[in-house]
């Protein structure tokens, strides 16, 4: 991911002219985002970039302001891990108009044509792993059940939740069909 950012055309580093990369993360409340942000900053600075790392405290209006400021301050590239992938249209439009490439990090920035790159994980596979964990933890291949389960997909503003859910359901559906897992609410879609 970081290596890919380092070779983006138009963002080459010159010894006398450091390029500025704006990185916005959703929150400091989760260790994962702290690690991602700090690791990205460390690697980019080691590659010769200046980095403006911001955390938005899970507040969309804060993230909008941070991105608008990064555009106004002349960032050469933006890396955005959004709180709500469909709520950043205006600052993304400003970035595009300013010719600033945008990397959507982990959470897809939706409803915008300003995204230059999308860096993420295999979210479907993550969902499969979640389903496999439940199969193993409940020993579903050896136990009769039934076990009650309710399924939650996550924030509708996070495009990844659809992939997580699809991957998990592809593993769990067999056990639901066999009656080993029971979804009392009936909500499996």
Regions found by a protein language model. Give the residues of each.
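Bacterial N-terminal signal peptides
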Residues: 1-6
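A residue-level marker of the well-folded mature domains of exported/periplasmic proteins
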Residues: 7-189
């Amino acid at each position: 991911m970081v290596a890919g950012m380092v070779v983006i055309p138009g963002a080459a580093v010159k010894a006398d002219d450091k390029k500025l990369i704006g990185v916005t993360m959703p929150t400091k409340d989760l260790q994962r985002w702290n690690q991602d942000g700090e690791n990205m900053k460390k690697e980019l600075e080691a590659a010769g970039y200046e980095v403006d790392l911001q955390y938005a405290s899970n507040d969309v209006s804060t993230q909008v302001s941070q991105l608008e400021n990064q555009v106004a301050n002349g960032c050469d590239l933006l890396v955005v891990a959004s709180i709500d992938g469909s709520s950043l249209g205006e600052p993304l439009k400003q970035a595009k108009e300013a010719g600033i490439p945008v990397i959507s990090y982990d959470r897809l920035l939706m409803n915008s044509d300003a995204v230059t790159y999308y860096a993420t994980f295999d979210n479907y596979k993550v969902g499969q792993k979640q389903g496999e964990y439940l199969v193993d933890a409940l020993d579903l291949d050896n136990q009769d059940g039934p076990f009650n389960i309710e399924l939650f997909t996550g924030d509708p503003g996070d495009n990844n939740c659809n992939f997580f859910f699809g991957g998990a359901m592809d593993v769990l559906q067999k056990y639901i069909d066999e009656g080993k897992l029971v979804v009392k609410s009936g909500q499996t879609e």
